[in-house]
Amino acid sequence: MPVTMSRAFLDNFLGNSPKWFKIAIISFLVINPIVFYFNPFVAGWLLVVEFIFTLAMALKCYPLQPGGLLAIEAVAIGMTSPSQVLHEIEANLEVVLLLVFMVAGIYFMKQLLLFVFTKMITKVRSKIYVSLLFCISSAFLSAFLDALTVIAVIITVAVGFYSIYHKVASGKTFGESHDHTSDGYPQLCEEELESFRGFLRNLLMHAGVGTALGGVCTMVGEPQNLIIAAQANWQFAEFAIRMSPVTVPVFFAGITTCFLVEKFKVFGYGQQLPDAVHKILSDYDAHEDANRTKHDKVKLLIQAVIGVWLIAGLALHLASVGLIGLSVIILATAFNGITNEHALGKAFEEALPFTALLAVFFAIVAVIIDQQLFAPVIQWALSYEGNTQLVIFYIANGLLSMVSDNVFVGTVYINEVKSALLNGQITRDQFDLLAVAINTGTNLPSVATPNGQAAFLFLLTSAIAPLIRLSYGRMVWMALPYTIVLSIVGVLAIQLGALEQMTQYFYDSQMLIHHSAQAAADGVVSSH
């Protein structure tokens, strides 16, 4: 039967995506202008829900195409303007540079990372200890690096482990070329492969949550932390001290949760590393040690020195994250002899599709701003006072961060609270407490879904996700125990008065000083 033009069009539209998904996207594109004509506010929330749907279906179709079509239509029908979209991208330029340069920079440090984490996996046989190591090390790194950078590190390590095992299990030697994305090798043991996938899923989720545990603690841990610190005129040490009444108990609760889910093997955790896989990784480690030349050792040393620069540069905020990432690329390639353009290009393959997706997301953010979708929630939260207001802001931030980008949510709320301060609705001390509630509210409950945490979304849409069968639903399920524990411990630290009491203690012991409203007015308004 000959293929008609209409059939060919439908076949080409969104490629190999399921037919029902194609029909759903077309339906959205037809419905949205009609709803917008009658009620722009409802149409705005409908668009947000539809975009979240495209993210949820990331393994059926990469969200850039369906989400991008929705965003283009939103601009075309007047839900927002091209200038507003450009403004959002400009305001978040540091995040864009982070994705373009920092993630690529980590690519050139993967030899060192694979060396360190391979030792960790091969030398520590207890799954519980390995899980705790991954969670704690991710938290530590995230206190100095952006969570996206840390998750890029862990993804690099996981892909390295997976490709090594897949190559050897397929009957090849370490040095041979191999396509680890194909399972069409008869030598592969399906049960063994599934167990290894489960093991890697566990480690990636523990590491992902670790980035949230560490990222909330310091002003460089997450992009929105920088925004909040700038608005409040806080420096690195003051930010960490002010957050500590909430972040310290939450950190220990998170580590305890990591131990418990592994111990009792619930929520998809407790997957063991098969002995055969451990032997392959151990053999690879021994093979690498035996064949490591002086040139290789110098490369590892150079990468270690660059790693020190990376942490120091970010901790001291010597330059923007993206520019430090660019310096990592230049230093790592120059001193390790990588001068071929094709070799350089490979480093950017992982991050650029996600960077384009993030730009589409900023278009959705522009709609949220222009249609004032969060305005009712903000006014409701400001109607409360005192400690109750802190709890309400924490919960309101948490709920919105579960479905929307936490950088955007944090930016919107801190700007609204700052306006309330400058208008005399709240005191400066209350503003400082609210800033803590906003920061912890955007960072902690947002681990619930990949929509809130950019690092989680990056993981979901990365090359490793389909290899280890990490879907949106599975991610939400595995994050659930962490979501419950972190959210509850965080809200209790505020509700029971620990935040107010400890902050007062810090004032009394002169670890903190009282700021004036004018100091906040002098803060730099930013949204990156």
From Swiss-Prot:
Location relative to the cell: Cell inner membrane
PANTHER family given in the database record: NA(+)_H(+) ANTIPORTER NHAB (PTHR43302:SF1), TRANSPORTER ARSB-RELATED (PTHR43302)
Transmembrane region(s): 20-39, 66-86, 97-117, 139-159, 241-261, 304-324, 349-369, 390-410, 448-468, 476-496
Function: Na(+)/H(+) antiporter that extrudes sodium in exchange for external protons.
Main localization of the protein described in the UniProt heading: membrane
Cellular component aspect of the GO annotation: plasma membrane
Reactions listed under catalytic activity: 2 Na(+)(in) + 3 H(+)(out) = 2 Na(+)(out) + 3 H(+)(in)
Name of the gene: nhaB
Entry keyword Transport: yes
Protein name per its UniProtKB record: Na(+)/H(+) antiporter NhaB
Membrane topology annotation: Multi-pass membrane protein
Alphabetical UniProt keywords: Antiport, Cell inner membrane, Cell membrane, Ion transport, Membrane, Sodium, Sodium transport, Transmembrane, Transmembrane helix, Transport
Keyword Zinc: no
GO MF annotation: an example: sodium:proton antiporter activity
Family listed: Belongs to the NhaB Na(+)/H(+) (TC 2.A.34) antiporter family.
